[in-house]
Amino acid sequence: MEARLKELKQKALELIEEAKELKGLNDVRVAYLGKKGPITEVLRGMGKLSAEERPRMGALVNEVREAIQTRLEDKISNLEKAVIEAKLATETIDVTLPGRPVETGCHHPLTAVVEQIEDVFIGMGYEVAEGTEVEKDYYNFEALNLPKDHPARDMQDTFYITEETLLRTHTSSVQARTMENNKEKGPIKIICPGKVYRRDDDDATHSHQFMQIEGLVIDKNIRMSDLKGTLQVFVKKMFGEDREIRLRPSFFPFTEPSVEMDISCMMCHGKGCGTCKGTGWIEILGAGMVHPNVLEMAGYDSKEYQGFAFGMGAERIAMLKYGVDDIRHFYTNDVRFLQQFKRA
């Protein structure tokens, strides 16, 4: 038995030395130290030895097993180290090479347009007011002269969360809250930018979510001419000094009288083209004098205070300003499209 153990040890160490891969070493471990290996078989036969031989043979078996185990661990460590070194050799980085430039981002065109619009109105003394996108039905409709049974509610399909809670369909709700909170202080001069939501089918000119910017002025002796002058300044700042405006009668429940504003086409300069559908004019926003009912519901005396309001879509302004033909481009995150506006 002693001679057999020495032979097993020598053979195992030779196989370990010859192994070139981790799989070969695992095969040696299973063959010699596994449950069905010769070392285990010797241990099972220890019971047949005399009491005098058993301690000596037990020590020899342990010595052989430890020698094989130690050599296996050393060889495995060496092979793993060699694998890592070979991998590192193929992945060597030449630190003298120039680094890859980091691509710089840019303002999203909608962000750029909203900031430009804000700058124009801040320059005219307006403040920026913001509000919650999840709104109560009261502030989105009722406080704006749209009671629950008003037929004009059908003009806007709404995302309702509960019977009295919804995703705002316009930022006019910010105006309603501002008027209510400011009735003791008097005059108001604000613009309200923010996301709004309507149940529209997405296409080239419509989106279920879009950016809207509304304006509100409340003070004594406010007239329609003040509204027109304000919008003229805005248009010339945004689209150039040669742009003209015209106001057409319209209807909005929260303003009276109500108008829609067109600007002279920047493509054909009023001569008529495909962009303006041959009219020479392009519609960009709605506006009007604040309805007396809206003033009264907010706590203002409509005989003492008047006001005007206007609202526009940031996407609409951006499409006209930059010649974008599909509103969906603003939301597809196409880097090729966005890179065009690095200087926007």
Swiss-Prot record:
Chief subcellular location: cytoplasm
The record's free-text note on cofactor binding: Binds 2 magnesium ions per tetramer.
Reaction(s) this enzyme catalyzes, per UniProt: tRNA(Phe) + L-phenylalanine + ATP = L-phenylalanyl-tRNA(Phe) + AMP + diphosphate + H(+)
Classification of source organism: Bacteria, Bacillati, Bacillota, Bacilli, Bacillales
Family under the similarity heading: Belongs to the class-II aminoacyl-tRNA synthetase family. Phe-tRNA synthetase alpha subunit type 1 subfamily.
Necessary cofactors: Mg(2+)
Keywords in alphabetical order: Aminoacyl-tRNA synthetase, ATP-binding, Cytoplasm, Ligase, Magnesium, Metal-binding, Nucleotide-binding, Protein biosynthesis
Annotated positions binding Mg(2+): E256
Any one annotated GO CC term: cytoplasm
Transmembrane segments: none
Record Gene3D superfamilies: Bira Bifunctional Protein, Domain 2
EC numbers for this chain: 6.1.1.20
Localization in the cell: Cytoplasm
Keyword Magnesium: yes
UniProt-recorded name of the protein: Phenylalanine--tRNA ligase alpha subunit
Coiled coil: none
InterPro entries xref list: aa-tRNA-synth_II (IPR006195), aa-tRNA-synth_II/BPL/LPL (IPR045864), Phe-tRNA-synth_IIc_asu (IPR004529), Phe-tRNA_ligase_II_N (IPR004188), Phe_tRNA_ligase_alpha1_bac (IPR022911), Phenylalanyl-tRNA_Synthase (IPR002319), tRNA-bd_arm (IPR010978)
Signal sequence annotation: none
SUPFAM superfamilies: Class II aaRS and biotin synthetases, tRNA-binding arm
One Pfam entry name: Phe_tRNA-synt_N
GO terms, biological process: phenylalanyl-tRNA aminoacylation
HAMAP family reported for this sequence: Phe_tRNA_synth_alpha1
Subunit-structure text: Tetramer of two alpha and two beta subunits.
Molecular-function GO terms, alphabetical: ATP binding; catalytic activity, acting on a protein; magnesium ion binding; phenylalanine-tRNA ligase activity; transferase activity; tRNA binding
